[in-house]
Amino acid sequence: MNAPTPAPSPVDVIPAPVGLLAELTHRCPLRCPYCSNPLELDRRSAELDTQTWLRVLTEAAGLGVLHVHLSGGEPTARPDIVEITAKCAELGLYSNLITSGVGGALAKLDALYDVGLDHVQLSVQGVDAANAEKIGGLKNAQPQKMQFAARVTELGLPLTLNSVIHRGNIHEVPGFIDLAVKLGAKRLEVAHTQYYGWAYVNRAALMPDKSQVDESIRIVEAARERLKGQLVIDLVVPDYYAKYPKACAGGWGRKLMNVTPQGKVLPCHAAETIPGLEFWYVTDHSLGEIWTQSPAFAAYRGTSWMKEPCRSCDRREKDWGGCRCQALALTGDAANTDPACSLSPLHAKMRDLAKEEAAETPPDYIYRSIGTNVQNPLSEKAPL
């Protein structure tokens, strides 16, 4: 009699994805220096057509995806954004519009509401208009954002304000909280900059010092207590000052997938920075095939790829080793422990790097733009 085949370890079983980040376009009227989009942005001519996006959404629903984040760039720059949103509603997918609120966003909002948009997440670069427009690189953006937010709440749509925090606006954290209350937002994200994409290029310009970060955390914690039942405040702390890393994207290939404007499917925003990974496109494979069979998704899924100290750490199934892209950028090896972790031998050096950059006079922003040959000022620096 043959022995029964042992059941696979729970961490080796491929779970169903929960969320899909649909990067519909990289076009955006804002030029934020912390943008998580890649340095080489997809042009309009390379974007997926409407029918392909509708197929992708149908396949996502079939896989068990519950949430679709309609993002970019600025998703309302797509002329088919209403049709795409309507498809989400038809499939029972919860749709979250991640928007700058400028350009044509307001003009399309009522139509999006009419076809079943579920939620709006509005980026706000600052409270003071001049500062916000300096950060976003677009004049007269703030009044447009306020008009957009007002219409969102008039329609009865739940509104989340997203404020990416850095040294240029960290003093405005109390103001972001007050603004969220004033606008009738249900949720506020106080998200300290995560240094990938354009933020990595601009790290020296964006890095706050530790005392500023600690004070912002204190302010948020006090506001959470004061506004309990009125406003939910999410807080994302900067990795460079953290004790433990975040589970990037909920764990590589465990919860989320990111479809780029040209149809490349990624386990996380910055995965393309890791050399040697083979990414599959929705034009060549179904979403289900990509989720279960793509070499890129398999590369760091689970725990078998881990080195020490991650391999034997009791947190290995909590943070999944942290961010692979950050490990590569700062240590030279994507399989190393994320240096955001206090158990990494390079953790202290990461803290020192942040301290040094925060103490220096910030350089000018390198603004996000399509078609610009960006020279990364950190590219000549050796890893930690």
Swiss-Prot record:
InterPro entries found in the cross-reference section: 4Fe4S-binding_SPASM_dom (IPR023885), Aldolase_TIM (IPR013785), MoaA_NifB_PqqE_Fe-S-bd_CS (IPR000385), PQQ_synth_PqqE_bac (IPR011843), PqqE-like (IPR017200), Radical_SAM_PqqE_MftC-like (IPR050377), rSAM (IPR007197)
Annotated GO biological process: pyrroloquinoline quinone biosynthetic process
Keyword 4Fe-4S assigned: yes
Annotated binding of [4Fe-4S] cluster, by residue: 28, 32, 35
EC numbers: 1.21.98.4
Span of domain Radical SAM core: 14-230
PROSITE patterns: MOAA_NIFB_PQQE, RADICAL_SAM
Keywords: 4Fe-4S, Iron, Iron-sulfur, Metal-binding, Oxidoreductase, PQQ biosynthesis, S-adenosyl-L-methionine
Cofactor dependency: [4Fe-4S] cluster
Cofactor binding, note field: Binds 1 [4Fe-4S] cluster. The cluster is coordinated with 3 cysteines and an exchangeable S-adenosyl-L-methionine.
SUPFAM superfamilies the UniProt entry points to: Radical SAM enzymes (SSF102114)
GO molecular function, one term: cyclase activity
UniProt keyword annotation of S-adenosyl-L-methionine present: yes
HAMAP family named in the record: PqqE (MF_00660)
Subunit description: Interacts with PqqD. The interaction is necessary for activity of PqqE.
Name of this protein: PqqA peptide cyclase
Organism listed in the record: Methylorubrum extorquens (strain PA1)
Lineage of the organism: Bacteria, Pseudomonadati, Pseudomonadota, Alphaproteobacteria, Hyphomicrobiales
